[in-house]
């Protein structure tokens, strides 16, 4: 069986945070079932970074994304360098997977691109 990468759905943070997380067994992709019925496993969000955190050990980092509909954290474990060039106030085009741990929905980054002009076509 060939495993295909799911397309990242361009969405709002509120679509993710207001949905219901569905965990599937095995290698099937977990997803958030949005209120409109859309399955969100990989998402693409245009947002502003409002907070950045790096643990003392340097093995965990997180940013908080805000797109004016809601906020959500993106977390990196061990591969924290992905957040190095980013600062609070930066506008980013974020692609990542939706995950849930202990009731908190969060994103795991795959691609983060700083945006100079949010009016440019993405």
Describe the function of each predicted region:
Residues 1-122:
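OB-fold and OB-like single-stranded nucleic-acid-recognition modules
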């Amino acid at each position: 069986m060939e495993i295909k990468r799911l397309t990242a759905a361009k969405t709002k943070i509120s679509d993710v945070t207001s949905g219901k997380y569905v965990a599937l067994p095995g290698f099937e992709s977990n997803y958030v079932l949005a209120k409109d019925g859309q399955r969100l496993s990989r998402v693409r969000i245009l947002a502003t970074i409002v907070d950045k955190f790096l643990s003392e050990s340097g093995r965990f980092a997180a940013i908080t994304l805000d797109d004016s509909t809601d906020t959500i954290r993106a977390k990196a474990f061990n591969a924290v360098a992905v957040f190095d060039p980013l600062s609070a106030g930066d506008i980013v085009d974020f692609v990542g997977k939706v995950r849930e741990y202990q009731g908190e929905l969060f994103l795991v980054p795959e691609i983060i691109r700083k945006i100079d002009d949010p009016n440019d076509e993405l």
